[in-house]
Amino acid sequence: MSEVGIDDIALHFPRLFFAMQDFAEFRGADYGKLNKGLGLEAMAIPDVHEDTATMGANAVSRLIDRNSLDPSSIGRIYLGTESALDGAKPTATYIMDMLEQRYSAKFGDNCFRNCDVVDMTFACIGAVDAMHNTLDWVARGGEKRHRVGIVVFADNAKYDLGSSGEYTQGAGGGAILIRHNPRLLAIPDIWGVSTMPVHDFFKPRREVETRTVVENVLELAEESGASITANLAERILKFIPRSSKKNDVLFENEKLMIHKDTPVFDGQFSNRCYSESVKQAFIDFRSKAIVEERYNPDEDEILTNQWSRIIVHLPCLLYTSDAADDT
């Protein structure tokens, strides 16, 4: 059986950026810690016309052009993101739409019609799940069917201004070409998995009553010096069902559901979660390798000593050696 893995990678970043040295001076932060400790040089910022879909589409387009791919040969485009544009349809459909507009003149209308697209969301690792799925799909087709898949990763990572996570903001996208006999990296079919249902980082939908919105607006009016009559908020709320604004999104229901792109998070708790997950994933990988007779702990060198590189999520950097030693 031929190997399956990463054949090529293309990246796209916005041209606008905030240099980390300037950010450190602006916030009074330690530039040495940000640059030398965490490897941060600049914070990419999407322009007004850029979002998750445009960044992903640019990366895929670069991958297609560089590898002279016929869109009809691409069986799937799976996107990993936590910055989706729509609550119903995959952001990958917007990427596909832009790609069709770009390539239809050369390859015909609907040149991506038979391409499967979907989004996968799991904080920072959604694209890993998308890649795992795509690797299995390509491998299952066999070398003769020559399946080609693209994994896209794109995000606009935002934090509240002045928050402890603000310096980790950024934006960008990338595309990974998955197929048989890869030029860059062959990926075996043993995966170590560790999933924990913890609340260290999430983007919940918040519920706000219309009454609260009206009362806050009136309070702002008073602060600005406007004269507000007694019980005005109550009168407005009673009048809304008969008003010309009754069907506006702000007033059509008694409560509003608000989604913010910035997360609720606990950085130190996240670090502990990352460390434990990496450790447990290594243990799971080791167990599976033993079951499939690819690793004998009594005769073989320990797994982590066999690998030339171990790549982990950045907050895991200081914890990796401890987790690996226990494996």
Which residues are covered by each model-predicted region?
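Cysteine-centered functional microenvironments
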Residues: 44, 78, 111-129, 162-166, ...
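Conserved small/polar residues in nucleotide/adenosyl-binding loops
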Residues: 319-326
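A glycine- and small-aliphatic-rich helix-loop capping segment at beta-alpha/alpha-beta transitions
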Residues: 90-105, 135-140, 165-170
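Active-site-proximal alpha-helical scaffold in enzymes
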Residues: 118-146, 155, 160, 168-169, ...
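A short, small-residue-rich loop immediately preceding and capping a beta-strand
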Residues: 75-78, 145-155
